[in-house]
Amino acid sequence: MTKVGLRIDVDTLRGTREGVPRLLATLHRHGVQASFFFSVGPDNMGRHLWRLIRPRFLWKMLRSNAASLYGWDILLAGTAWPGKNIGNANAGIIRETATYHETGLHAWDHHAWQTHSGHWSIRQLEEDIARGITALEAIIGKPVTCSAAAGWRADGRVVRAKEPFNLRYNSDCRGTTLFRPLLMPDQTGTPQIPVTLPTWDEVIGPAVQAQSFNTWIISRMLQDKGTPVYTIHAEVEGIVHQPLFEDLLVRARDAGITFCPLGELLPTSPESLPLGQIVRGHIPGREGWLGCQQAASAS
């Protein structure tokens, strides 16, 4: 049996309102639990449209047929009008999710984090994280114990900024296996659970066709030599490609794969995890930098 952590990112108002309820129903039908990470502040995702001038981002949008994949309400959110507050508008849905699944913070403002966190000060990072955690805790009525950086935009500064919040784990980067981020030679931070597998929008196109994606990604899960973690998005697998995701759950079960919340991947003694650090890097299929796992030593 292969155990795979299932991470569900919720970036937008529509993803929360429409995608999450469908995902909850789908997961319930198949007896699967996952980790949901919510954006709870303003939905300004449409402001990413200016990135179309960048060839890699434009190619990604064309390759994934973004207009039909996400919908124009997502692609234009927060452009001609102020972004609506996701948490306030969907508190009931978020509370229901937290009743049945591990629930953590993705971002206060997903667009702002993805665009500006790379040059924010530690204080600005802490203030933004605190705003998101406070809002999410007010909605679900219990402490937030985990987080996942929006767009995997994280580095050593983000690791340090999250330390005051006493989280059980963070999932801020791409990598191969769980690790303890090294803060100083004699100090480590909150355990990291990296995403190890590609997302739909990173690979779909000439190399991998939609109809063969599930076969392809299951093969990658079974071949993963580390601790497999897979990310889906409420805006994609919860709406347009919900049938594809349901088919994935069936195929994965038949292949001996069990999905679980990320928290279930943590060992009893986190001190046993290897040391590492998060550095800025790039991966195929994703425009811009993102946090990547790198080995480190205590010396």
Swiss-Prot record:
What chemistry does it catalyse, as a reaction equation?
A: 4-deoxy-4-formamido-alpha-L-arabinopyranosyl di-trans,octa-cis-undecaprenyl phosphate + H2O = 4-amino-4-deoxy-alpha-L-arabinopyranosyl di-trans,octa-cis-undecaprenyl phosphate + formate
Q: Which HAMAP family match?
A: ArnD
Record's function text = Catalyzes the deformylation of 4-deoxy-4-formamido-L-arabinose-phosphoundecaprenol to 4-amino-4-deoxy-L-arabinose-phosphoundecaprenol. The modified arabinose is attached to lipid A and is required for resistance to polymyxin and cationic antimicrobial peptides.
Gene giving rise to this polypeptide: arnD
Coiled-coil segments:
none
Domain (NodB homology): residue spans on this chain: 2-260
Q: Which pathway?
A: Glycolipid biosynthesis; 4-amino-4-deoxy-alpha-L-arabinose undecaprenyl phosphate biosynthesis; 4-amino-4-deoxy-alpha-L-arabinose undecaprenyl phosphate from UDP-4-deoxy-4-formamido-beta-L-arabinose and undecaprenyl phosphate: step 2/2; Bacterial outer membrane biogenesis; lipopolysaccharide biosynthesis
Which of the seven top EC classes does this enzyme belong to?
hydrolase
Q: What lineage is on file? A: Bacteria, Pseudomonadati, Pseudomonadota, Gammaproteobacteria, Enterobacterales
What InterPro entries does its record include?
A: ArnD, Glyco_hydro/deAcase_b/a-brl, NODB_dom, Polysacc_deacetylase_ArnD
Key words, A-Z:
Antibiotic resistance, Hydrolase, Lipid A biosynthesis, Lipid biosynthesis, Lipid metabolism, Lipopolysaccharide biosynthesis
State the EC number(s): 3.5.1.n3
UniProt-recorded Gene Ontology molecular function terms: hydrolase activity, acting on carbon-nitrogen (but not peptide) bonds, in linear amides
List the PROSITE patterns hit by this protein, alphabetically.
Answer: NODB
Please give the name of this protein. Probable 4-deoxy-4-formamido-L-arabinose-phosphoundecaprenol deformylase ArnD
Q: Which GO terms describe its cellular component?
A: membrane
Family recorded in the similarity comment: Belongs to the polysaccharide deacetylase family. ArnD deformylase subfamily.
Q: Which GO terms are recorded in the biological process aspect for this UniProt protein?
A: 4-amino-4-deoxy-alpha-L-arabinopyranosyl undecaprenyl phosphate biosynthetic process; lipid A biosynthetic process; lipopolysaccharide biosynthetic process; response to antibiotic
